[in-house]
Amino acid sequence: MAETNFNYSKLLRNLVTEDNVLNEVVVSFLYQLFPRDLFVRAFSLLESADMFIYVWMPTPKEADELLESLYNGTPLYRPIVRPRGPDDRPVCVDLDHWFCSCTEFAATCRPHLVGDTPLSDALFRPTEAADPDDCFGMLAGLQHLRADPEKLMCEHLFAFAILLQTDLRVLRHFSTGPGAQVFVLGITSIDEWLKLHLNVV
């Protein structure tokens, strides 16, 4: 199969079986598929209990409804990674615009900023469209993207994309039950939502 036709979402949604168990065969394959230990770092982040997804919901919802809305609805949400040290800052992720506030992601653009070529010319060119069913792989087919998608990826973007752009089953596996390691929190108060943006985002 040609790399341009590879459906990452279809593969990553098989990370968790129907019985809510990690599929070790898929985990091993993904380890080989992604470069420079990216999968290992993203998977470690998924198991770190440092990932939070804050969801704005003016009307309170049950926990399962809240998770389903992240796949079946269009809620306003903020994926955030808790700082690891006292001097660290929270990492904010925006999957819709493929942006992360971490230094690793910023470093991918830095060489283009110091060069003579404008950033838009350095990173963009016409490309073929991606498979419309492959939410996770859409980065590779963004109109005009020149840079290698793997270079515009960090562990935070990868981990949240695994949770939010593959299958609801994967999100449930990591965010529900006694062993939950990713926290999905609904916010119903506009004051609390604004405080989140002032204090974290």
Curated annotation (Swiss-Prot):
It is found in: Nucleus. Keywords: DNA damage, DNA recombination, DNA repair, Nucleus. The keyword Lyase does not apply. GO terms for cellular component: nucleus. GO terms for biological process: DNA recombination; DNA repair. Belongs to the SHU2 family. Plays a role in a RAD51/RAD54-dependent homologous recombination repair (HRR) pathway to repair MMS-induced lesions during S-phase. Required for error-free repair of spontaneous and induced DNA lesions to protect the genome from mutation. This is Suppressor of hydroxyurea sensitivity protein 2. It comes from Eremothecium gossypii (strain ATCC 10895 / CBS 109.51 / FGSC 9923 / NRRL Y-1056). The gene is SHU2.
